[in-house]
Amino acid sequence: MNRESKVFIESPILKEAILNTFKKLHPFLQAKNPVMFIVFLGALFTTWIFFKDLYYGVYSSFNLQISLWLWFTVLFANFAEAIAEGRGKARTDSLKKTRSNIIAKKLVGNKIENVPGTLLKIGDIVICEAGDLIPGDGEILEGIASVDESAITGESAPVVRESGGDRSAVTGGTKVLSDRIKISITAEQGRTFLDQMIALVEGAKRQKTPNEIALTMLLSGLSFIFLIAVMSLPLFAEFVAKEGGQSANLSIPILISLLVCLIPTTIAGLLSAIGISGMERLIRFNVISKSGRAIEAAGDIDILLLDKTGTITLGNREARDFYPAKGVDEKYLADVAQLSSLADETPEGRSIVILAKDKFGIRERNLSEMEGEFIPFSASTKMSGVNLKKEGKVVRKIRKGAGDSIRNYLHTLGQKISAELEETIQTISQRGSTPILITEEDRLLGVIELKDIVKGGLKERFASLRKMGIRTVMITGDNPLTAAAIAAEAGVDDFLAEATPETKLKKIREQQAKGYLVAMIGDGTNDAPALAQSDVGVAMNTGTQTAREAGNMIDLDSNPSKLIEIVEIGKQLLMTRGALTTFSIANDVAKYFAILPALFGSFYAVSEVGPLSALNLMKLGSQKSAVLSAVIFNALVIPALIPLALRGIVYKPLGADRILKRNLLIFGLGGMVIPFLGIKCIDLMLGFLGII
């Protein structure tokens, strides 16, 4: 999967970025980046010196060129940030087009009123039919529909949304293609999922991450040290010059140029662009991150917790067969199972109704006509069912639930599961299916097999995660036998069976207490506490509203294997920042040895050449040529690295040691060699053109 644009910078983005480049020259905006603010002040000061000298009739070509190239340095850094913001803003503009004035069909009593979507409040009930735009975020209360979510996800294929289960959430701005659904609004206007997406992808509102703040403080500290060092140079030079009977020629523009070349302007100029582009690259993979911190954490995660239903499996467990107890007719079991599921709006419940109808021709019945009282599923009992009444009295009590819950239920009634059915339950579990038991009164009628379907391609994806050093753990409420079978089929490293929201939360806290960073993928309301606690919580877009609010990332494609791309982008972000920091500091070392010998080469000279000139390995033309060449190189290296900052360095699933050695060789050694070559080439060009 590759959503990278074929055109690296599109024309509209480029035009707006150029305009914003000059807008960012505002001193308040420049002060947010301490290193580049020094360059900004230096450009102002050298410009003032040039015009002051010009006012007194002194024209200095050198001072003019220094001023221009210092301004170019500031502008190139502004341009890098503006381009990164522009690429994210293009996505924002397309989302804003989706947010239009939608007329909602609000249900008031038994009547439908047409009202503007902007007036809807939490709890309002709306009706959406084929061709309608969904007016706001909500949960489907009744019905099933095919929905076009291309305006949000970019995917043209429609998706199914239905009441019950983990596919009940709908997003404002999407379009109903078929059928009719009743929706309860769950978000106020201005706080919808679409509004959140727009706010998140707007680069101007992006907050710096703790790592960015720490790196900015480090770069500021280095800049302060270089500032003190450069300020002391005139005193040192004056002392040495007097001792040798010479004069020191260190003008203020030369000192400012030296300072700008020594401070880490490269990484400082690209730092914001790297962070913004990390979020923008996620957006290209249809993942919305609520913070840059989540992206950074994704690059460092150690353990990935995966919810089974809807994440590893397709999420729609289907009833496959009925297994009656001894002495029970299979058709009777199917009839009772259907009765227990008539009011069950979950996909599993509906599949039981359909299986009974398809296999035995048992037609659906109206529970209200039968005086039926539906018993909804309870997290405490882990059972559901129905009480059938006659003249107000319960005459049939039917229950449906997992093995342990029915086992405990029968135990309270003085009954137990037969050895034959226990064997059936174990067999069903061992092949990765879920056994659901049906009882009537105190009698166990049999077992229904619900089959989980594992999503394709996961095994290979999890193998790639393993190479990255990430351990995968599947979390499920199923019994250990079923969990083990599905875990083996999916290829995860470990599993946690019979999990509850509390055990998920406990598992995450235990791993975090050991110093591990934990990522959690989920889509259900019961996943919300774990998603909120985890360092990286990726909620599926097909999941519930609660899950989407709890996670700090949302996968619009609802593809759990997308975490590999998320991890790669996180690692790319960290590695790109580290690599360019290494390159920038290595540049400073190289420029130090390039400029200082040229400045002080004539000191202690007996003739025209002093002993310090031996350090002038590059044999630069003159003092001014050396300084100007270094300033030009320092400015040009920023736009040269913009593509790398925006795209990120190439990541391969290698060991940390190999990656470190590789990047030190490329960006460390390369960062020292390239300035020598670049500055020398510029020096030769300046000499050839006669500019100095």
UniProtKB/Swiss-Prot annotation:
It catalyses: K(+)(out) + ATP + H2O = K(+)(in) + ADP + phosphate + H(+). The chain crosses the membrane at residues 35-55, 64-84, 213-233, 254-274, 592-612, 626-646, 672-692. InterPro entries: ATPase_P-typ_cyto_dom_N, ATPase_P-typ_P_site, ATPase_P-typ_TM_dom_sf, ATPase_P-typ_transduc_dom_A_sf, HAD-like_sf, HAD_sf, P-type_ATPase_bsu_IA, P_typ_ATPase. ATP binds at residues 344, 348, 377-384, 400. PROSITE patterns: ATPASE_E1_E2. GO terms for biological process: potassium ion transmembrane transport. The keyword Protein transport does not apply. One of its GO terms (molecular function) is P-type potassium transmembrane transporter activity. Part of the high-affinity ATP-driven potassium transport (or Kdp) system, which catalyzes the hydrolysis of ATP coupled with the electrogenic transport of potassium into the cytoplasm. This subunit is responsible for energy coupling to the transport system and for the release of the potassium ions to the cytoplasm. This is Potassium-transporting ATPase ATP-binding subunit.
